[in-house]
């Protein structure tokens, strides 16, 4: 298993949720009494990952207010896809180049600690370099 102190997470939380017909960002919709974003954050923390960057987009102020400065946020002003959202975190990621990065969707409430730990375990022998 990888060293959790060197793991960080990027949570993509810029979705609008057009089909939900609301001004609330999609990751802020509640499932079992908690915003979906909180489920993703909780799973990371339960897996020992506390270094978290949340990428915001649609109605970003709602998410930033909800997070209350507890996590680093990056605003993606134009939603140009998942890859672009991750690219918005490049400066944050460069400061963490010696660790593993987990990328999660902020609207996936059923991720859990065991899934995260399982996803990170094979990366102990993999190394990617940032451009």
List each model region and its residues:
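Conserved N-terminal catalytic core of the sugar/cofactor nucleotidyltransferase
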Residues: 1-8, 34-105, 110-118
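N-terminal nucleotide-binding beta1-loop-alpha1 segment
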Residues: 2-22
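Short, glycine/acidic-enriched capping/hinge loops at junctions between secondary-structure elements
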Residues: 21-24, 64
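Short glycine-enriched, charge-decorated loop/helix-capping segments at active-site entrances
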Residues: 24-30
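Conserved small/polar residues in nucleotide/adenosyl-binding loops
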Residues: 126-131
